[in-house]
């Protein structure tokens, strides 16, 4: 998986 910023609300 690519490195991405994951934000969980």
Curated annotation (Swiss-Prot):
It comes from the Bacteria. Transmembrane segments: none annotated. Its cofactor is [4Fe-4S] cluster. Its EC number is 1.97.1.12. Residues 2-9 form the 4Fe-4S ferredoxin-type domain. GO terms for molecular function: 4 iron, 4 sulfur cluster binding; metal ion binding; oxidoreductase activity. It is an enzyme of class 1 (oxidoreductase). The keyword Methyltransferase does not apply. It is found in: Cellular thylakoid membrane. Keywords: 4Fe-4S, Electron transport, Iron, Iron-sulfur, Membrane, Metal-binding, Oxidoreductase, Photosynthesis, Photosystem I, Repeat, Thylakoid, Transport. GO terms for biological process: photosynthesis. It catalyses: reduced [plastocyanin] + hnu + oxidized [2Fe-2S]-[ferredoxin] = oxidized [plastocyanin] + reduced [2Fe-2S]-[ferredoxin]. Binds 2 [4Fe-4S] clusters. Cluster 2 is most probably the spectroscopically characterized electron acceptor FA and cluster 1 is most probably FB. It is a peripheral membrane protein. GO terms for cellular component: photosystem I; plasma membrane-derived thylakoid membrane. Apoprotein for the two 4Fe-4S centers FA and FB of photosystem I (PSI); essential for photochemical activity. FB is the terminal electron acceptor of PSI, donating electrons to ferredoxin. The C-terminus interacts with PsaA/B/D and helps assemble the protein into the PSI complex. Required for binding of PsaD and PsaE to PSI. PSI is a plastocyanin/cytochrome c6-ferredoxin oxidoreductase, converting photonic excitation into a charge separation, which transfers an electron from the donor P700 chlorophyll pair to the spectroscopically characterized acceptors A0, A1, FX, FA and FB in turn. The cyanobacterial PSI reaction center is composed of one copy each of PsaA,B,C,D,E,F,I,J,K,L,M and X, and forms trimeric complexes. This is Photosystem I iron-sulfur center. It comes from Anabaena sp. (strain L31). The gene is psaC.
